[in-house]
């Protein structure tokens, strides 16, 4: 793969979002992994972020999943659910969410909590039509309380 061009990679990933950009990043990443890291995925989060296309969230995912680092990757689901249920105080950025969750969730639970929040966001606390009636934690949910308070006053 280090010798592959973006044009060679593209047909394999054309069905995903932003395939041109991702093909370019994958080609650059493969070269860099071989040339600078001996073909090994680095365990250091800062080193991971040097790879083309790898930002903080992706580095944290790799760190948590592959290297069992006690970090909290924040994607759209983690961000939304954390704000809705009150794990954060309506944070404005993924970084604020990450830092707040890392402060209050026991560090050994962070990688698992990341998956819990993603799954909850994908299947229960969805972006457009959250399934509050099916939610096992609606009793403690800030959004649920606010929505019910609003509907009672209308």
Located regions from the model:
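Catalytic cores of DNA base-excision repair glycosylases
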Residues: 1-152
